């Protein structure tokens, strides 16, 4: 075989010409020690706080403690495969998550990876999970209602778009039920072809809950047709503490996409006490100094920087909004514990749920006396303002009188009348789960209550009266509901028609 020297030199020259000098430079460290979801890493001198790092087996982590001789890394996953002496790579990116409409209808983990078996996420954009909240200039005061569909809340403790309203109570008092009903109530707003300014997308963040509970929640959303406008972020009880810590920030970033693009979203953190516990665990393992109840000193900042990201933006910034409904679980109704007082002071009001009321059959078990909305009637329609102003005062008087009435048996007629009305209004505010009411339906029901049409009825008949009145108004007298819905007001003309209908119905009902 004849090989010519010229050919060989040509081939060699060709090979040398195509030889690239691009060498990939990555900063690499070594694991000094690992355990309890925390790794101490040596050699990552230029790593940023909050930067994502990658271990040899592909597990991700986040650099939290930057010390002189090592870096404390929290691990987003199992630490079993990570051994002392293994290498750790910098990724040069701060922890981020996919955002956009491609996430709607999906269930993701705390880093935005799908866990529902429906294939990869169709999202083109990624955003950092921990960003600064909007400043003072882009904001606008809350001025439009975020209807929950629950009479007790929409009438007495109204929530507006862009507000932060805390749902607080002991375990098993119906906190998640309120959140679920709120999501289901947005279905009429999110119909196909509705204007973006009307729609309200929902993000539900489950922190430290049982997997079965989250699966049940998702199943209900799917059955009721609410999953298509919702995103579920799940960091369950079996997930490592860093995942439970980061999940609310991930969900918030997904909600912010809608807020910043002139749309509206509501985010439910269920619940933040479990996030605080996860953060306490991480902080203590990172050897940060403990404070009250062994929580780290910056646990207030943890929640305030998260909840400040919920805002109503002004027209120059797209007029979008992000409403936050954080949930806090108390122990034995103790609202004065560390985390509950922190979150109460950060939010714009709280819905306080009580075990005693729950077991008395008053559900939703809202304690109307202790619950407040610091946004108030600016988050209500004119129609609701007209009827709800009375019910607040009457219930306050009723609570005061009921306390005294226990001692005296001979009550004068006016006190007796007040107690009767209060008992019926309390009955009127009860509502079964999965049956949210539209704003105009709530208005007519409360109108009947505050104007004394229930006073002659036995308390047990109040529910039947309400159902009958609503079916009459949805059927023959649908014009009244339409008038209230379109004008968002209870005009004198509509009020007169409504009065006539309620009066004639009350006569036939009795």
Curated annotation (Swiss-Prot):
What residues bind ATP, as annotated? 169-176
The answer to whether the entry has keyword Membrane is: yes
What is the similarity comment for this entry? Belongs to the ATPase alpha/beta chains family.
Q: Which InterPro entries match?
A: ATP_synth_asu-like_sf, ATP_synth_asu_C, ATP_synth_asu_C_sf, ATP_synth_F1_a_nt-bd_dom, ATP_synth_F1_asu, ATPase_a/bsu_AS, ATPase_F1/V1/A1_a/bsu_N, ATPase_F1/V1/A1_a/bsu_N_sf
One Gene Ontology term, aspect cellular component = proton-transporting ATP synthase complex
> What GO terms are given for molecular function?
ADP binding; ATP binding; proton-transporting ATP synthase activity, rotational mechanism
| Quaternary state and interactors | F-type ATPases have 2 components, CF(1) - the catalytic core - and CF(0) - the membrane proton channel. CF(1) has five subunits: alpha(3), beta(3), gamma(1), delta(1), epsilon(1). CF(0) has four main subunits: a(1), b(1), b'(1) and c(9-12).
UniProt name for this protein: ATP synthase subunit alpha
User: Primary place of residence?
Assistant: membrane
* Source species of the chain: Rhodopseudomonas palustris (strain HaA2)
Signal peptide (UniProt feature, chain positions): none
